[in-house]
Amino acid sequence: MHIQLGLASIVTRAVSVLVFAFSGWASTSIVARRLTGRSKSLYESSNNALYEDQDGLATEASTKAFSDQWQRWVLALLSAIWFGCALSATIITLVPPQSQLLVPVWLLGFNSIVLCLESVAFFAEPSSVSRYNLAIYAFWTSSLTITLPCAELYSSQSPTGRQSYIHLEGPTAWLFIAQITAGLLRSVCCLLIPRRPNVWHDGQVVDQEFSGSLFSRFTYDWANGLLQYTKQNKSRMDIDSLPQLRSSGRTENLYTRFEQVRGSKSLWKALLVAHWPSLLQQYLLSLFQCVLSFGPQVALYGILKSLEGRLAMPGEDTQSWQWVAALGMLLLLGSGVDSWLWWLIYSKLAIPVYQELSAMVFAKAMRCKDVKHTAAEPAGPGAEGAEEQKKSGQNTVNLAAVDARRVSDFAMFNHQILTSVAQLVISSALLVRLIGWRSLLAGITVAGLTMPVNAYITRKYSNAQEELMTATDRRTRLLSEVLRGIRQIKFSAMEQQWQDRISEKRSAELQVLWKASLYNSVLVLIWISVPVMLSAASLSVYALIHGELTPSTAFTAMSVFVSLETSLSSLPDLFSRGLEAMVSMDRIKEHILAPEKGSHTTDVDCILFENADIMWPGGRHERLEDFVLTNMTLQFPPKGLSVISGKTGTGKSLLLASILGECEVVTGSIKVPRAPSLDERHDNLATPANWIIDTAVAYVAQNPWIENATVQQNILFGLPFDGPRYRQTLFASGLARDLSMFPDGDSTDIGANGVNLSGGQRWRVSFARALYSRAGILVMDDIFSALDAYTGRHVYENGLTGPLGQHRTRILVTHHVGLCLPRTDYCIVLDKGTLKDVGSVEEVTNRGSLTDVLDELSVAESHDEEEESIENIEYIQGEEGPAAIEQPPDSNPTARTAPQKFTSDEKRKTGAISLAVYAAYIARGNRVWLWVFALLGYALYTALMVGRSWWLQVWTNSPSSHHAQMESLASYSVTQKVISIQTEGSLLHFLGIYVAISIASCVIGTGRYLATVVAAIASCRQLFNDVLTPVLRAPLRWLDTVPMGSILNRFTSDMYVLDSKVGLTLSMLATRASNIAGILIAAVMVSPWLLVLACILLLCCLHLSSTFLAGAREIKRLESIAKSPVLEHFGSSLTGLLTIRAFGKADVYVNHMYARIDRHARASWNAWLFNRWLGLRMTFAGAVFTTATAALVVYMPSISASMAGFVMSFALQFNFAVSLGIRCYANLEMDMNATERVLEYTSLETEDQAGEQPPAAWPTHGRIEVQDLVVGYAPELPPVLNGLSFTVEMGQRVGVVGRTGAGKSSLALALFQFLKPRQGNIFIGGLDIAKLNLHALRSRLAVIPQDPVLFSGTLRSNLDPFDEHTDMELYNALERVHLLSFDDTLTLPSHSTPASSVTSAWLSEIDPKSNMFASLASPISEGGMNLSQGQRQLLCLARAIVSQPKIMILDEATSAVDMQTDWLIQKSVRAEFGRNASSLLVIAHRLSTIADFDRILVMDAGRAVEFGSPRELLESESGFFRTLVENSGEKAVLEKIIYDQD
């Protein structure tokens, strides 16, 4: 061998030395610091210290398991070998003629010293992270050093006619080879050095991406452990089995950083600024990958060109083999870059952007003004305006569940815009080089004709997407409201009507989806036809100009066109995602720009109102329906009890909300003491001495907000447990006795919004939360409404004014003024939005205002202190105070079993998605024939694409002569049989068939997509209906125990996947499967050996995919499950927003959301990690197949250039087709998880809808007969009614009393057949209701619950949801419940005599102009929140009156109204029900409510302990009812009511 010397060679080596010196500076500095004793580790302070960084802390076990010793010793050994070889070569160069190599060899010797110095540095550096960073330098040092001996060996070939060369062989050559080998091994060893021990955060290991070596990181090898664990522990996998996210990937850190950079920037600009490093890497890598993607085409051109030359010079294959090697290296490099690009954009962009936006939406929601108290103005009857959507809590959930996902998806794919442009430019340059500018211009002209159509359809598609989002919001919002009010709907037997309404919204949504899909189909046609027609036109013009078409030109051009086609074919999805992202970002922007709740506190000592006009946020002062409090001038005494009273709807709750800063101050000012922030409170350091913070606020809402947690967790509300205070709180709030009846005491899980508690218990838990809190200011909204007399007095004396209530500022809204009057310090009387009177009790009494209120109580013939119920017998007989309360369960956990969970955990299947799921999806829409047609379309499309390439092979293999014979190699079998096909045809003949095939492929390609879309929409339509029906008809027990977030997850996220992804993924999978089939067919046509190789690689791919799918399925299921808590937390927090903010806990709930989003992100992160693990290995396998195909083509001399072009054009697609095909299958399996979850709900157990149809007029009378009734909530639970027997004759009014847990509410459920009899019977109107059809039964009865349920819409839509009654019937019902006065009805177009003639001066004072109930078109906001609690109860009562049932059940239905209104309502109820063959059952706490009834049913332990007339029960010597009356404190008053009745 000979080496040519020159100045350029010496300069190159000198530059290399400088690079090596730069690479070695790190090791030199490390050794120098170590020698001078100044070496300090960044993370480890000593050998015994545990490693810690921002991600987490290492454990002793992980520290012991971590080691990089063998890597360092191997590096030292290889460095020594290199040094020995370099030293030997240096000595040899001292002997002529090798002395001419003195400079390069001595430079190599110098480099060997640097390598040795690096090896020493690995032992001198104590920090593992620093050693890892040093390994990066060492890798480049080794890699660059190798280039020198490689260059010497490569240039050692002796060029003919040159004189300046030397002989290089023998020892010198072998020493160079040894150095190259040692350098390669050293580079590999550097890649194997781990970075750090595994670190832990919150008790869980952190993701190991940055714990392992560079090799592990770039090959995703750190996923192996989790993959194997998932495969072996499918049934035990949960979110806690997954590693924690790194610090930079945790939601709190991401959101904090995002908010810092956002400022006043637009959201798009903020995302760019926050993620510019990742975006820059994305764009650079994508551009690099774009350039690399054309490398195989260049190599293909080189191979085909060399094969064409092989005919003239047989045996000259050197250049061909060089192109084969180049092809293999380019494919491998491209595979690695592509895999890393997709990992980067998902892990560093898609997931973080989703986390940031979800957190931002929630954090903003926690700061937004609560506008749900203000109704939207409908655009017309039944219309839903945009304002209503903005005020919907469900719309906010959609922003995080759907819109944030769409924006993050676009962040994942946006780089394809840049790469598409780059591919277009590079493709154009290559095509100009291959076929000339005229041919390319012809193709571009044909493609340009579609641009106007493309622009028009794109605009239409964008509009359709906006319509689709709006339609989805409307459907989801309605569904959310229905689920919240499902109990009322089931009681009213209106499941079908509401299902029809939801189905109507769903149909409108699917119509828009179909319109968007049609537009998208046109775009698909354009994007398929453009590259196909581009290639057809370009090659046709080229052939016409040149008269021939060579294989190298044709197939290379075709390969470029295929790349262009692949790029352009992704544009429909890219444009779809881009347009969706723009629409979604606009929606998020609108939410972010919504007004926020401002700071309302200042440095004052007491709460002051100075001539303030107050209204709910979002309202307008001039709108009649927007209630306004005017001229409020108040000063609440510190540490005193202030009582706010007034009639129903006078603004009492609005006044409380204004203290909390939840209202808009139109004029004047409100001053509230400033409370310390959570960080300033130091709750963990609280002691009894400093427990109360005078300026902190606690709030008890009119609708108590209860978390889906245990009783204790609801009371503590995040505060530390203080045993004595906790027990005192339970006693003061009257909860001690209730907890003793719960199966798990205060560890009882009480379900979403306290569904497992009675109304009174929910109120007392909410009050206990306020009592236990550290707040010095307690703001309470009528805590006595749902309490019986004794419990109310107990709470008043021991809670409100007891030890825990004293020395705190207490502001209370109540209708029970008489109860609170003795200890009231400040009294406020409201009337029609103004201050009727204010001052001390004495001042207000002297002015007569308080006397008026007390007179109303007198008129109502009731007073809380005169009331009693059976609930209190045990209190009276044995209450011993807080000291007698048992230690809470948490204090002795070992003595208890694990508490039962009321809410059920979401189920998760394991293993592969069953074929039954796929079959069910396909069969649901009754469009099986369309699926078959689509499948045939994919097969035909592939056949056309193979046929097009085959025809091109025939064309390029034909002789130039017009009538010449053409020999074509149709197949290459084992017997090497060659079949000659004799063809004659002109150039136009070839062109005509080629263009015809191209056009046919465009039509079939579009048709298959359209068939898939139609079939998918049909399946989605039916699946939605199939899941909606059982959910609406599920037993109440299931609806109560399944979190609403889990149900909504099915109807939002899962349905979104079904609507938008499953059909597309099926289409993509079919495309890739047919592509692979086409490639295999092409391989068979050339050589069976290629088929064998392809099958081997496919088996390897299937093995890898089986490992991947075993883990990916479970992770995807976990991801779906992890989303439900996010949605549940959204809904729960928005429901309790006022309570959360009043307690100053908004930031706490934001942190809770961070944790839930992180758990979801962990599943998404690992799902994509598994995807990349598979993708890298698949693309490497594809690169091997393509390279082997090229080698076989070059090796076999009998294969012509045209046949080689044919097979290579498909082989180049194998890499992409296999990897994307398996990725599509994985995505389909993960998307089908949504189908699996939806199908799970289609098989829910539903209530039996069968049964006999009663006569049309049934019940003609309201007689109820209960015989020995035994019912329970579940077969495994004990009975709640045990042998209950009683009879209600028609026309009777029956009161039901009993302590909590006596079975009163269970009786109501049994009457409606929500609880099926285990024994006994219930006869209504002479028929056994157990044998009746449920709808027929429930539609003939009516119940008014304690918690009223209203739906957003209008007054009419709530009174008469399905337009079955006239306006006057509705107005009459409103008049009967005294929401309208007689004078109001006179202003109506027509007037009918009201059923009740009860009017009073109080009624006549209502101003018709300010009464929203005077118009049936008056808007009702979501949940009826623009009405007071009392107004909502009255509206529900009016709704029941409209239905005119024969049997009416009231469950303390007027607990939230003032006493006089209650008296008026009770009088109306008595006039409407319990007369004229109808019956009335009232479950009541106020004894005066039922004291004059015909019968009293006293219940205890599920039995009727007494049943008879009030007089009979009162005269029973030892009866329960008599005990109630005697212990009431006002025995004479109750006796007067009872005896006057007779």
From Swiss-Prot:
Alphabetic keyword roster: ATP-binding, Glycoprotein, Membrane, Nucleotide-binding, Repeat, Transmembrane, Transmembrane helix, Transport
Annotated binding of ATP 2, by residue: 1298-1305
One MF term in the entry's GO annotations: ATP hydrolysis activity
UniProt xrefs under InterPro entries: AAA+_ATPase, ABC1_TM_dom, ABC1_TM_sf, ABC_transporter-like_ATP-bd, ABC_transporter-like_CS, ABC_transporter_C-like, P-loop_NTPase
Residue positions binding ATP 1: 646-653
Compositional bias of kind Polar residues: 892-902
Residues passing through the membrane, by range: 5-25, 74-94, 103-123, 134-154, 173-193, 284-304, 325-345, 417-437, 522-542, 544-564, 927-947, 987-1007, 1062-1084, 1089-1111, 1173-1195, 1200-1222
Cellular-component GO terms for this entry: membrane
Listed SUPFAM superfamilies: ABC transporter transmembrane region, P-loop containing nucleoside triphosphate hydrolases
PROSITE patterns linked: ABC_TM1F (PS50929), ABC_TRANSPORTER_1 (PS00211), ABC_TRANSPORTER_2 (PS50893)
UniProt domain ABC transporter: residue ranges: 609-857, 1264-1526
Membrane topology, record value: Multi-pass membrane protein
Location of the region described as Disordered in the Swiss-Prot/TrEMBL record: 881-905
Positions annotated as glycosylated: 233, 631, 708, 756, 1233, 1426, 1476
Domain ABC transmembrane type-1: start-end pairs: 312-580, 932-1230
Subcellular location as annotated: Membrane
Function statement: ABC-type transporter; part of the cluster that mediates the biosynthesis of a highly modified cyclo-arginine-tryptophan dipeptide (cRW).
Homology family: Belongs to the ABC transporter superfamily. ABCC family. Conjugate transporter (TC 3.A.1.208) subfamily.
Record's protein name: ABC-type transporter avaQ
Name of the gene: avaQ
